[in-house]
Amino acid sequence: MNVVQGNIEAKNAKVAIVISRFNSFLVESLLDGAIDTLKRFGQVSDDNITVVRVPGAVELPLAAKRVAASGKFDGIIALGAVIRGGTPHFEFVAGECNKGLAQVALEYDLPVSFGVLTTDTIEQAIERSGTKAGNKGGEAALSLLEMVNVLQQLEQQL
């Protein structure tokens, strides 16, 4: 039986982190978690990490698409925070962001890790950005590292 399974060390991986500035007090913690994970677990050097800042979550897919089209990166981590309010705006922003990032991954055959918080309350977002529910930025980085390795293995075996 042949099992393809990624590990999380990716010393030579070139990673772009596309991050929204909206809700920056939360998103900066996600960025810290992602970078810490890339460096500590993935052994990725500072020189191989590029951070791209955009206004909000809606802009993440376009920036990710441009990064992917450059052909210079092994993967992309998207970070942001969308918190439900009193209007349907939340569903539109969260849904389009998710769909757009998934489309980039499929169109460019490149791992795009979804580290965008989509929560009902600010308290839930705070919990997921480095307090009692962990750091979803770090989790997105772990997922990306594993997928970079899985895709490299598939390329070698297929």
Swiss-Prot record:
(2S)-2-hydroxy-3-oxobutyl phosphate binds at residues 86-87, 128. GO terms for cellular component: cytosol; riboflavin synthase complex. InterPro entries: LS, LS/RS, LS/RS_sf. Pathway: Cofactor biosynthesis; riboflavin biosynthesis; riboflavin from 2-hydroxy-3-oxobutyl phosphate and 5-amino-6-(D-ribitylamino)uracil: step 1/2. Coiled coil: none annotated. Signal peptide: none annotated. Keywords: Riboflavin biosynthesis, Transferase. The keyword Transferase applies. Pfam families: DMRL_synthase. GO terms for biological process: riboflavin biosynthetic process. It is an enzyme of class 2 (transferase). GO terms for molecular function: 6,7-dimethyl-8-ribityllumazine synthase activity. PANTHER family: 6,7-DIMETHYL-8-RIBITYLLUMAZINE SYNTHASE, 6,7-DIMETHYL-8-RIBITYLLUMAZINE SYNTHASE DMRL SYNTHASE LUMAZINE SYNTHASE. Catalyzes the formation of 6,7-dimethyl-8-ribityllumazine by condensation of 5-amino-6-(D-ribitylamino)uracil with 3,4-dihydroxy-2-butanone 4-phosphate. This is the penultimate step in the biosynthesis of riboflavin. Belongs to the DMRL synthase family. Forms an icosahedral capsid composed of 60 subunits, arranged as a dodecamer of pentamers. HAMAP family: Lumazine_synth (MF_00178). NCBIfam families: lumazine-synth (TIGR00114), PRK00061.1-4 (NF000812). This is 6,7-dimethyl-8-ribityllumazine synthase. The gene is ribH.
